[in-house]
Every structure is written in structure tokens, then in C-alpha cells.
């Protein structure tokens, strides 16, 4: 009986951590899905007014980011692997791997990024304040990382 209670307590504790982590990760997931769908309004809706993207050696505002996201003839499927996260009051810090499979009629490629974000709670929702993204070289695949497909 003690083992059953310990197991149930573990499940409840694990679920609450997972729920909290998924809530703070929502703006990240929503932003990447908006990029995949070329949805500029949604991209803007998940960031705060001071948002900056540090993208592979460049500093971008949300306007810069939106301007490079143009409709194209491909399907993008996203995958994530959260390394860790920490919440301090109304600010959260998340480190994660990001994988995109880009597929068109001619080919399919995987692209990998190592990313970190700062999200801030504004009212009752989390918004992206800062994102740092480093793209891995084309043939470099992160070792020992298990990716989870983004739920749409």
C-alpha cells in the first residue's frame, strides 16, 4: 500500500511539474507553429513589446522576424526537446532543442537549433521576451536527444 501511495504521489507531482512546464512553453510552441503556418498575426500575439530574437549572430525585433517568414511551398513539422526550465515569479527561463523537418515535393531535410528563451507573465498569459537561437551545421545531429513532435 505504501508503494502505491508513493507512486500516486509521484504521478501527481510529475503531472503538476509537466503542466507548469508546458504552460510556460506554450508561447514558444505557438511562435514556431505560427512560423510554420506563415501566420504573422499569431507571431506578434505571443511576444511582448520588448521582444528580441538573437538569431545566429544577428539581433532581430519581431518586425525583422515577421519580414523573413514568407509563404513557401513546403510543409514544416516541428519537434522539441526541453533541456531544462526555471520559473522565478513572473519570469521563466527555458533551454531546449528545436528540430524542423522541411518537406516539399523534391526533398525532405531536418534542421536543428539549440535555443533558449525568456518568457514573462503578462496578465494571465506567458509571452516571449527574448529568444536566442543557434542553428547547428547541416549534417550535425544532437546526440542523445529525444525529440517530441509538436501537437497541432
Where are each of the predicted segments found?
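A short, structured loop/turn motif at beta-sheet edges
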Residues: 85-92, 119-127
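Hydrophobic pocket/interface hotspot
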Residues: 31, 42-43, 51, 65, ...
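Short solvent-exposed beta->alpha transition segments
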Residues: 44-81
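Low-complexity, intrinsically disordered terminal/linker segments enriched in charged
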Residues: 122, 130-152
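A mature extracytoplasmic/lumenal domain signature
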Residues: 47, 57-58, 96-100, 115-117, ...
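Short, low-complexity N-terminal intrinsically disordered segments enriched in polar/charged residues
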Residues: 8-45, 86-87, 147-152
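Surface-exposed, charged secondary-structure patches
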Residues: 67-109
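Positively charged n-region of N-terminal signal peptides that target proteins for export
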Residues: 1-4
Amino acid at each position: 500500500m505504501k508503494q502505491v501511495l508513493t507512486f500516486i504521489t509521484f504521478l501527481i507531482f510529475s503531472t503538476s511539474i509537466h503542466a507548469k512546464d508546458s504552460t510556460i512553453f506554450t508561447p514558444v510552441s505557438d511562435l514556431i507553429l505560427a512560423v510554420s503556418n506563415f501566420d504573422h498575426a499569431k507571431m506578434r500575439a505571443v511576444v511582448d513589446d520588448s521582444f528580441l530574437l538573437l538569431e545566429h549572430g544577428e539581433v532581430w525585433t519581431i518586425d525583422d522576424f515577421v519580414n523573413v517568414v514568407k509563404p513557401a511551398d513546403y510543409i514544416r513539422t516541428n519537434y522539441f526537446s526541453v533541456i531544462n526550465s526555471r520559473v522565478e515569479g513572473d519570469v521563466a527561463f527555458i533551454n531546449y532543442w528545436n528540430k524542423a523537418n522541411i518537406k516539399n515535393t523534391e526533398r525532405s531535410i531536418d534542421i536543428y537549433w539549440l535555443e533558449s528563451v525568456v518568457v514573462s507573465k503578462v496578465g494571465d498569459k506567458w509571452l516571449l521576451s527574448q529568444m536566442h537561437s543557434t542553428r547547428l551545421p547541416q549534417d550535425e545531429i544532437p546526440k542523445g536527444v529525444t525529440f517530441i513532435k509538436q501537437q497541432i
